[in-house]
């Protein structure tokens, strides 16, 4: 269904993407979230936003409409550990409560927008570039749902900012931890990882080089052992035994039939 919708937009002449300063905004219902789950949610974005910025290729032209999380808000929500939504709301608007009734509140222009949550009961993810590629759109939705699931199911998510010198490997591990495992999510992982650099299989690339060298050496040794086994000389006793004719070494009936047919054909 999603693929058909995207194709219909293309056929109708739809255009989108960073060059048009257009983004994909995904809204997820959070009416049943607890204050702790909202805290988990914003902590996930705060800790992984550097990864997300690179993986999602957030356009510089769109950054005025999609900032990273407000560090002061993240610090306050984790220090005060609010027990109800009104406390979170006060922290979000920094006490300027009249903003909650403004559609274009400045607080909405962040990667994870809680302004829409306080207004309509659903939060908004604003980091994605616009796309008319069904696979990319699907990967955006799947990632949003996986983050939502982590916020709801995990007891606590740390706001500590993740760093890595091998972004491709670290982001892939995070996707697997979110549950994007197996063939079902293979295309999603491919789209989300395609802009990142690094060794996807090894945390430290030099470990991968060493492992591949060891594997190559092992295979060469196995091939050499197989060649030596094929070229192993046969002992004299076994040669003599092979050359001694067996008693009653008469041809079988089927062998005789074959010889008779050949003789008849040659006549």
Residue positions per predicted region:
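C-terminal accessory/tail domains of diverse enzymes
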Residues: 1-18, 31-267
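Short, conserved phosphate-binding/catalytic loop or strand-edge motifs used
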Residues: 20-24, 28
């Amino acid at each position: 269904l999603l693929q058909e919708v995207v194709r219909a937009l293309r056929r109708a002449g739809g255009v989108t993407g960073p060059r048009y300063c257009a983004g994909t905004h995904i809204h997820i219902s959070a009416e049943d979230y607890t204050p702790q789950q909202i805290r988990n949610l914003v902590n996930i974005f705060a800790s992984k936003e550097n990864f997300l910025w690179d993986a999602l290729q957030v356009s510089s032209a769109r950054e005025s409409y999609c900032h990273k999380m407000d560090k002061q808000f993240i610090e306050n929500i984790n220090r005060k550990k609010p027990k109800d939504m009104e406390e979170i709301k006060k922290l979000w608007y920094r006490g300027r409560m009249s903003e909650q009734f403004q559609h274009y509140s400045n607080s909405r222009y962040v990667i994870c927008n809680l302004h829409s949550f306080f207004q309509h009961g659903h939060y908004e993810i604003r980091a994605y570039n616009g796309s008319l590629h069904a696979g990319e759109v699907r990967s955006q939705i799947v990632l949003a749902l996986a983050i939502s699931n982590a916020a709801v199911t995990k007891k606590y998510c740390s706001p500590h900012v993740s760093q890595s010198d091998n972004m491709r490997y670290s982001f892939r591990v995070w996707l697997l931890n979110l549950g994007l495992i197996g063939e079902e999510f293979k295309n999603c992982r491919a789209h989300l990882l395609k802009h990142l650099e690094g060794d996807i299989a090894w945390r430290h690339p030099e470990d991968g080089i060493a492992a591949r060298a060891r594997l190559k050496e092992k295979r060469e040794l196995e091939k050499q052992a197989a060649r030596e086994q094929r070229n192993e000389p046969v002992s004299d006793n076994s040669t003599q035994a092979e050359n001694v004719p067996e008693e009653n070494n008469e041809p079988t009936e089927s062998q005789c039939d074959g010889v008779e047919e050949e003789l008849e054909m040659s006549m």
